[in-house]
């Protein structure tokens, strides 16, 4: 008799736990956009995914074939990676007219700034990071990524020093993922 009560109680707790941990009926998954990351010669390097979050954007990069070391990475204002130098991606995403770059700059307003990423000796990069400076829809007075001309995620040849203008000394654009 005792084991039946225990089993019934355990089953009831399990059912309640399952219902409590299940997604809320009718709740939508967050908006997520993915794009191919390309090298200057058009070679596919991997995938970049940007997911809408309540206070910004979650960015995930999975790539192979990049040069080893630290690299600057930024959100750029246009979803166009069609030229070899990725200049068509424009400047960093921003809300104002005059952009001041640098995560460590007290006067910074550059909404395209992201932390540096590290590529291992094998050329592989796997990173997931969060930005509160930009969002897919421009909510909370952030810069809008998914606007009419889209946006790009650009990886640079060198690390961003987070202070110098205009791009923190990060150098040439070596990889680009366009989002339209």
PLM feature spans:
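Bacterial N-terminal signal peptides that target proteins for export
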Residues: 1-12
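Short hydrophobic "helix-edge" motifs at membrane interfaces and signal-peptide entry regions
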Residues: 12-13, 65
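Hydrophobic h-region of N-terminal signal peptides that target proteins for export
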Residues: 13-23
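N-terminal leader/targeting pre-sequences
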Residues: 21-180
């Amino acid at each position: 008799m005792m084991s039946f009560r225990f089993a019934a109680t355990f089953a009831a707790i399990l059912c309640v736990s399952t219902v409590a941990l299940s997604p809320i009926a009718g709740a939508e998954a967050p908006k997520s956009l993915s794009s191919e990351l390309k090298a200057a010669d058009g070679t596919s390097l991997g995938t970049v995914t940007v997911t809408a979050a309540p206070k910004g954007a979650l960015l995930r990069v999975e790539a192979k074939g990049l040069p080893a070391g630290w690299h600057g990475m930024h959100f750029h204002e246009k979803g166009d990676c069609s030229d070899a130098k990725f200049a068509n991606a424009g400047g960093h995403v921003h809300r104002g007219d005059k952009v001041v770059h640098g995560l460590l700059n007290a006067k910074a307003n550059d909404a395209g700034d992201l932390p540096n990423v590290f590529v291992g000796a094998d050329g592989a990069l796997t990173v997931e990071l969060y930005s509160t400076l930009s969002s897919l829809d421009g909510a909370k007075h952030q810069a809008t990524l998914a606007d009419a001309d889209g946006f790009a995620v650009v990886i640079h040849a060198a690390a961003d020093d987070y202070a110098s203008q205009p791009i923190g000394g990060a150098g040439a654009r070596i990889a680009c993922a366009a989002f339209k």
